[in-house]
Each structure stands twice: as C-alpha cells, then as structure tokens.
Amino acid sequence: MAHPHLLAERISRLSSALEKGLYERSHAIRLCLLAALSGESVFLLGPPGIAKSLIARRLKFAFQRARAFEYLMTRFSTPEEVFGPLSIQALKDEGRYERLTTGYLPEAEIVFLDEIWKAGPAILNTLLTAINERHFRNGAFEEKIPMRLLVAASNELPEADSSLEALYDRMLIRLWLDKVQDKANFRSMLVSQQDESDNPVPASLQVSDEEYQQWQKDIGAISLPDPVFELIFTLRQQLDNLPNAPYVSDRRWKKAIRLLQASAFFSGRDAVAPIDLILLKDCLWYDAQSLNLMQQQLEILMTGHAWQQQAMLTRLGGIVQRRLQLQQQQSDKTAFTVIKEGGMFSRRPHYTLPPEASASTLTLLLQKPLKLHDMEVIHITFDRSALELWLTKGGEIRGKLNGIGFAQTLNMEVDNAQHPVVRDISLQGTRLALPGAAEDSMPAEIKQQLETLENDWRQQHTRFSEQQHCLFIHSDWLGRIEASLQDVGEQIRQAQQC
C-alpha cells in the first residue's frame, strides 16, 4: 500500500486533473470523486446547462478502463432503455427471461441518470436494488454489478410523501449547484476550446481495479475516535430537538460515517477527525430549509465545540471570576485606610490619617489605572495638610496626577470600609494604596491556570493545523474555524496581560 501522504498527494493531483476546464465546480468534482472512491451515490440539484452531466463524464477518467452509462429519464422511459433489452434469442430458444446488458447500467462503473424523478416505478425498484446491494437480477440469475458511482441529477427535489423518497434517501451526497458566478470564470468558460470528451487524467494517476478493491477494505479500517463520535452524537441530538430538522435515518448516518472514513483515508489519516464532519452538511439535508439549517448547526459545532473552543472560553470565564475574587480580597488588604473620628453629635463623619502617613507629601497608588483629566493615571501626589483638611471638613480635594504638573481637582470619597476612592468621569472608581502595599502581580494560582489553558489552546490549534489539509473541505470553512480558535487565543492572551 502507498504511504498515506503519497496517496493523499496522488488523490489531490487526480482531482486537479478532473477539475481542469470546469469552472466553479471544484468542490462538486472533489465530492463526486470521494463518492466514487468509496462506492457511494450523489444527487446534483440545479438548473439545466450547468455541467451536471459533464461532471459525471469526467469521473469516468478517474479509473482505468471504466465504462460509463448515462441516460435522460422521461415519463415514458422503460427498463429496457436503462438495464438493457430482452434477449429474443434466449426467450425463443430456451424460454429464458434475460436482458442483454452490454453497454447498459448493469455493466457500467460510472452511471449518470438525468431528470431522475421522472423515472417510473419499474425502473425505480430495480435501481434501488442496484444501489443497495450492487446486484442485478437478470432472469434466473443474480449478477453482481460493478457500479462505483451513481450520479443522479434534476432541477427539482422529489415531492414529499412520494414513492421517490426511498431512492432519494439512497443518495448520500446532495449538492446544490448554480450557474457560474465569477466574472473572470464566466469569460474563461465562454472562450474555452477544450474538448469535453478528452481525457485530462494522466495514466499514472488513474485508479486500477486492484487499488479500488483494496481501498474499500482500507476505508473500513479507519477508526472513529471517541471525541469525534461525541461530536456526531451531539449533532444528532441537536437535530432531534429542532422542530424543523430533517429526518435522518440510521442507515443514512451509517453510510455518512463511511464517507467520513473515506475522507480521512484519502487525506492520509488513520482516524476520522473533526474536520471530516463538515462533509455531513452535504449528506443530511433534504430541502432548501434543511440545507440552511445544516449549515448553521455544523458551523456551531465546528466553531464552538470541535476543537474545544466553547469549553476553553468557559474555563477562561471561571479563571477570570476567580481572579476578580482574589483581587477583591487583595484590595481589601492593601487599600489605604483612614481612621474614622466622627463624634456623637457630628452631622457627618470625619477622618484622620493613619500614623504611617506622616510625610508632608503623600503619594498614593491607584489599585487600577484610571483616565483622569485626559491622562492615564497610576498614582496621585497629595499635600498632607490638604488631605487632612478634606478628611476633616470635606469640600474640594486636589492632587498631582502621576506626581507632575499642577494639582488637579479630584472626585474622591471615603467608602464604608474607610478606604479613599477616586472616580473618573464615568464614575468608575478605584481604591488608593500606599507605595509598597499595592500588589500588582498576578496571583500564582491564576497565572498557572492561564498557562495551562494556553497550553491546551496550543494543542487544539496544532491538532487543527495538522488536520486541516483535507481535499474535500472548502477553504471557507477552514477560515472560519481558524478565526474561532484565534479569538479564543486572543482572549486568553488578554487575560494574561491584565
């Protein structure tokens, strides 16, 4: 078996070759390739003329000697046109009911059925068996069919509560396509002279029959780690609790997990990773409403839980709360305290300075910086006599901000715990402390918890960086996940700097 990273590189190059000359169809090609490599079915929804059939034709070139069958369904289509005509010779000579399947669906590896919902019951019933069991009953014999990929297409969804729902449920990947949107891509498409029938894939990249069969076994060996299963189960519970969520059968969940295993395998990994779960957005929707719902639920899962983003923010909130408690305790211990001297008949209490404040000029530190008179202030210098007068009689008090310039008027008061408090213009206040009493350093307990949290964040970010090289996931999702992790990291860094 090829080295996992070499296999991932080969599949990436194979996809690039298949995408050549197709504009704004890279994601569709990649998911159809993933479906083909894992033996699943795809439904393409979109208006006529947007290269749905060309996508299916291209996938034939991913394999060596692959045969393709395509058919446009009408309400008058017969099983003979899809599964092959009856053998008149066998019926006449031997009385056997047998179809001539050469060139028809039972002998094709790649199958494209356009306007699939117009198929009649006789075709649908046989098609269901072909998709489910990869077998076709031809007369008295059960024949194994080689189909690796079924691409069904339509410009509409099947009607609810119709006989078509069983077939729709078998189509694991569902893609909603639209016209080319980008101006440059539209121009390139108009002037392109590429022959659609040309094989764009070098022989060295094409998949042999032996490789395909071996890969089916290898895909089944990819593990589903417990944390990833928990994410899947969380998503399932969220969907079950939403009133407008689509019904997802157990069979569909099981087939979707195999697709995630294939994504991991062809990305060079031996286990399903959270990044693979993004593929579920193309597997679990039913209509336009549920498509938007799945996008929202997957985004919540990927940007909030898949790499512990919300859990880390919750831990950070607890650490910050604990730090505030410790700071309050420290503030009570280190705050500058005056002595209450109010007499029995005094209309207002008055205070005196403590013995340790004996200097003629007093510099008091703000326990947290405030913006006063358009200046970021960390300490204030008072004239001792002016401070004593204010404590005794009240009135105006002035001090030099950061010990410089002229003394400025201050909004100050003494709180119930006998601590002088200075306030800014928005009335945010902070207590004052004598130099040497204020404790600016972060408590060791908090510092250790923040360092542990930062290490956990780095581990999660490293996991994401290692797993994000997944061919089948659109880069927009990677950007949103990276932004969510960076937001958590920034909040942790801000907490460390406070």
UniProtKB/Swiss-Prot annotation:
UniProtKB keywords: ATP-binding, Chaperone, Cytoplasm, Hydrolase, Nucleotide-binding
Source superkingdom: Bacteria
Regulation: ATPase activity is stimulated by ViaA.
Reactions mediated catalytically: ATP + H2O = ADP + phosphate + H(+)
A GO CC term assigned to this protein in UniProt: cytoplasm
Chaperone among keywords: yes
CDD domains to which the protein is assigned, alphabetical: AAA (cd00009)
Positions contributing to ADP binding: Y23, G49, I50, A51, K52, S53, L54, E196
Class in the EC hierarchy, top level: hydrolase
MF terms (GO), sorted A to Z: ATP binding; ATP hydrolysis activity
Cross-referenced InterPro entries: AAA+_ATPase (IPR003593), ATPase_RavA (IPR023671), ATPase_RavA_C (IPR022547), MoxR (IPR045427), P-loop_NTPase (IPR027417), RavA-like_AAA_lid (IPR041538), RavA_ATPases (IPR050513), RavA_LARA_dom (IPR046898)
Disulphide bond pairs: none
Subcellular location: Cytoplasm
Enzyme Commission code: 3.6.1.-
Quaternary structure annotation from Swiss-Prot or TrEMBL: Homohexamer. Interacts with ViaA.
Family indicated by similarity: Belongs to the RavA family.
Function recorded in the entry: Component of the RavA-ViaA chaperone complex, which may act on the membrane to optimize the function of some of the respiratory chains. RavA functions as an ATPase.
Protein name: Regulatory ATPase RavA
Organism in which the protein naturally occurs: Salmonella typhi
